[in-house]
Amino acid sequence: MYRKSTLAMLIALLTSAASAHAQTDISTIEARLNALEKRLQEAENRAQTAENRAGAAEKKVQQLTAQQQKNQNSTQEVAQRTARLEKKADDKSGFEFHGYARSGVIMNDSGASTKSGAYITPAGETGGAIGRLGNQADTYVEMNLEHKQTLDNGATTRFKVMVADGQTSYNDWTASTSDLNVRQAFVELGNLPTFAGPFKGSTLWAGKRFDRDNFDIHWIDSDVVFLAGTGGGIYDVKWNDGLRSNFSLYGRNFGDIDDSSNSVQNYILTMNHFAGPLQMMVSGLRAKDNDERKDSNGNLAKGDAANTGVHALLGLHNDSFYGLRDGSSKTALLYGHGLGAEVKGIGSDGALRPGADTWRIASYGTTPLSENWSVAPAMLAQRSKDRYADGDSYQWATFNLRLIQAINQNFALAYEGSYQYMDLKPEGYNDRQAVNGSFYKLTFAPTFKVGSIGDFFSRPEIRFYTSWMDWSKKLNNYASDDALGSDGFNSGGEWSFGVQMETWF
């Protein structure tokens, strides 16, 4: 009985243990399945979140791409507008107005009229100028009207007309003594698209004009070289990056052109070469039958006048004060023979002899000396022989110095000293007498400007001035109809006072 009970209990325990073990395994599996399901759910959630983020990112990328495209389009539009504006800014098409004028009044120390002008000395007849500051009483005006256009093919056109007038009268109405004159009227054609090689970018011109590359010494009112007339030519033929040339043909008339018997014309063929700061200019002149030209009374004007001539210029244009300091300077050596012996105004003097020879040197510079002081020296000298009569001689030299002392931005004190020596032997031509001697001029001029007070080339200016002049007594005898020695204007010292305006734009 005991063994049966014991066996029954053992069987019951084993059965219970197996059942408990089985129950434990099922619970563990269910727990694992639940955990796995939870992890799967979390993974799905994370995947969904990632998918949402990816969608948002893709949408943002699409938005950015669209914005970038919009910005690109906007940038292109801005670039196109900018290009159009730049083209419009560069396009100088339209009308322009430019001008030059000077006008003033002058008197001597007695409150009466006096002589003045840059060419009042005997040397002035052959181009010997002196300082102009406080030494001009005329009214002279130049008015320039231009029309420019740029075509779609890049070609340019320019038309210019200049009207000028000069007066010595102080009256407001001067029509009866007016010298109103059309000094220039010409057309230029530039950047022609069919021009290639050296002619690419060159400019054709024709008409009545001052040559583009003339230059002067402003303080003594003298051109270094002045080529002008009616004709045609071409500018800026470029042989290489450093060498360019101009070629032109000008025509001028000698004598009274109203005289129907005067058919003498002077033709000037010019080559003008530029290599960096260097300039080399050569001209040939011809005036057929100039020695047979008659005046308005039918008399022979000058039987020994030249029919041909040559002219040459060697120039140096510096962008510094003779290479020594900041500033600018220009220097030129000129030579002329025959009709070319008038070396400043090429082809303007029909009385020159076939054997006439002239040498001239010209130089000027500008430089600041300090914050308030600036200086502009100038020199002009000439030697001419066999000019109008056999054996004649005209020698002179001018030295000029102008100083500017800036007081403030609108007021300066200008000082000018001018000295000229001359030795003239005209050999009786035009009843002129042989003389030699010196001329002196000193000027003090308080000056008002709107700005750039120390700039020698900025205008407008209003000047109040006083000048003192004196000269060798012998110079009074040069001619009966010139300034020196005339009534009330003799050596021994002459004072003058005045006010003048000058402007250009």
From Swiss-Prot:
Signal peptide: 1-22
Keyword Transport among record annotations: yes
Region of interest: Disordered: 44-87
Annotated compartments: Cell outer membrane
Record carries keyword Membrane: yes
GO biological process: monoatomic ion transport; polysaccharide transport
Gene Ontology molecular functions: carbohydrate transmembrane transporter activity; porin activity
Bias type Low complexity, positions: 62-72
Alphabetic keyword roster: Cell outer membrane, Ion transport, Membrane, Plasmid, Porin, Signal, Sugar transport, Transmembrane, Transmembrane beta strand, Transport
Membrane protein topology class: Multi-pass membrane protein
GO cellular component, one term: pore complex
Major localization listed first in the record, in broad terms: membrane
Family as reported in the entry's similarity comment: Belongs to the porin LamB (TC 1.B.3) family.
Protein task: Porin for sucrose uptake.
Quaternary structure note: Homotrimer.
Domain notes: The C-terminus helps to anchor the porin to the outer membrane.
Name listed for the protein in its UniProt record: Sucrose porin
